[in-house]
């Protein structure tokens, strides 16, 4: 949280204040003691948001070419958030708004070569925010396959539909 607040405000005291506030809140301790997995989802959602803010700031300063690292790290964090709990998928909507918003802001800067950057951002967005998270989500089911080598995509799909119907 310290890094996130510091990146947003560029002030050390704001980072310290955010860190102190998160340390003073006992929700994460309570949730970990009652064995809910929300703390994992929350961590990866915040990590993905941190990398998206870094990406947005980097795009406005360096362009899309110089911003692939935060984009890739954000996609990995998003994938881990989705793999730990479906709530991470909903957080993806917020990430998409930031992602599209920074592309709009970059377009408003009237930089030459914007459409080349836009194509790179679109390919990077699909690769890092759709393909990589999906592969991470699939990898989270490897223990099923290790236990039962006949576990296939149909079984994986049945797990998804069962989770959906259980929660709806």
Protein language model regions, located:
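Transmembrane-helix signature of membrane-embedded glycosylation machinery that interfaces
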Residues: 1-10, 49-56, 139
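Transmembrane-helix signature of polytopic, membrane-embedded enzymes
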Residues: 2-24, 59-69
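Short helix- or helix-capping micro-motifs
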Residues: 15-23, 50, 78, 82
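Short acidic/glycine- and proline-prone juxtamembrane loop motifs at membrane-interface regions
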Residues: 30-40, 86-87
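Membrane-interface transmembrane helices that cradle and orient dolichyl/undecaprenyl
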Residues: 48-71, 100-109
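Membrane-interfacial entry segments at the cytosolic side of transmembrane helices
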Residues: 69, 110-131
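Transmembrane-embedded, aromatic-rich helix segments that form part
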Residues: 87-105
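Aromatic-rich transmembrane-lumenal/periplasmic boundary elements in polytopic membrane proteins
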Residues: 135-168
């Amino acid at each position: 949280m310290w890094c996130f607040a510091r990146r947003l405000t560029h002030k050390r005291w704001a980072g310290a204040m955010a860190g102190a506030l998160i340390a003073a809140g006992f929700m994460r301790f309570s949730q970990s003691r009652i064995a809910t997995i929300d703390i994992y989802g929350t961590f990866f959602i915040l990590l993905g948001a941190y990398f998206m803010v870094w990406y947005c700031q980097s795009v406005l300063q360096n362009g899309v070419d110089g911003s692939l690292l935060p984009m890739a790290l954000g996609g990995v964090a998003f994938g881990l958030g989705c793999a730990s709990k479906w709530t991470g998928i909903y957080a993806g909507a917020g990430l998409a708004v930031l992602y599209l918003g920074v592309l709009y802001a970059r377009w408003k800067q009237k930089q030459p070569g914007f459409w080349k950057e836009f194509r790179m951002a679109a390919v990077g967005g699909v690769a890092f925010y759709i393909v990589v998270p999906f592969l991470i989500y699939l990898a989270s089911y490897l223990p099923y396959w290790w236990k039962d080598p006949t576990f296939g995509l149909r079984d994986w799909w049945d797990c998804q539909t069962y989770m959906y119907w259980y929660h709806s």
